[in-house]
Every structure is written in C-alpha cells, then in structure tokens.
Amino acid sequence: AFDHTVEVMTAAAPPPATVLAAMESAGFAMTHVYGLTETYGPAVICAWHSEWDDLPLAEQAETKSRQGVPYHMLEDLKILDPETMDAVKPDASQLGEVMFRGNIVMKGYLKNPKATEEAFAGGWFHSGDLGVLYPDGYIQLKDRSKDIIISGGENISSIEIEDTLYRHPDVLEAAVVARPDNKWGETPCAFVTLKDTAVGVTEQNIIDFCRD
C-alpha cells in the first residue's frame, strides 16, 4: 500500500467490484469512466457523491463499478431497446443497448456508409454494449451484445458471472464465454486460474460458490 493517495482513472473492460475494492484499500482513488473510439474517448463517468464515502468499502466498490452518467459535453445518453427504440425502465434490471447522441459522437465510418447507417439506426449511435439503468440515472454495463449468453431464452451476462467468480477467495483470473448446448442453445463456460495458495479447490466448489 502507498502512504499517500494515488488518483487513477480506469476504463475499457468493466472492472470487477472486488478489484476496485482491492485497489482502494491499497491507496488508489479510482475514477471509473466509459466511452468508445466513436465517442472520442470517455463520454460517461461514475461521478462520486460525498455521501457514498460513508458506505462500507465493499458497497463503495459496487457503486463505483457502475459506468455512471454522461460527461457535460455529451448531448444525451440512453439505454434503449434496439428493436423498438423504447427506453428501459430505471430499475437496474431491464436490459437494453447503450446509445449516444451529441457532438462528441463521430459522424460516421470512413468510406463505409452501410456500417454508418446501421450504427445510427433510429437517430442514436448504437454502442453494441448492453446495460441497465439505475433509479439515480447511473448506467451499468452487463455485456457486449455479441457476448451475451442466451440460454433457454434467458439472457445471461458473462460480466456478472465473472464478477461473482472474482469474489471467490481462491480465484486469480476468470473469463466466461458461451458454450453450445443441445438443450439450452448456449450455457456459460468459465475458464478460471486459481491463486498459487489455493488448496483442494474443485470445479464443483466453484460452481457451488456461483450458485450461492
């Protein structure tokens, strides 16, 4: 741990809450941002509220793992049903696609009008990221649309499973993908690296932990 606070900005793949908690306890003050090349970099920030400082560290990490709210330069940010373009409910559970609008969003893909038309269908830039909207207006990513696992007609977030796996005290690394299944169409398949200190941890131990 450091003897002083180190300010860090994290982006790209959504960090598990356990990783954020470990970083904070080591003296890093984490700021979580989200964006794409098409939005000129970061366009969303998990703006911190002082009242959250009183939350337990684990709850602070859970709160900070959300992507957040729009930067001031962004005209609008919504989570919409990509088929109907209806807004999702702010209930932190209804899944939709994250969409952007504003002058920090690109005009289009170079010499690719078809891709540009598809990306801006309905007047919004489609990010390809799936997420939920919280009652306080903060968004949280759940998966890439191409990575979501559809099992028996249900959408399963690979990111949520990975986040659960990282909570296991003996898990060092985790990655979840879809595996073809004759009955369900797809089922989650996890690739896990255990810590060197792990003893006697089995596949069934990991499965039972996730179920609990």
Tell what function each PLM region has.
Residues 2-4:
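Short, conserved loop/helix-junction motifs that constitute active-site signature segments
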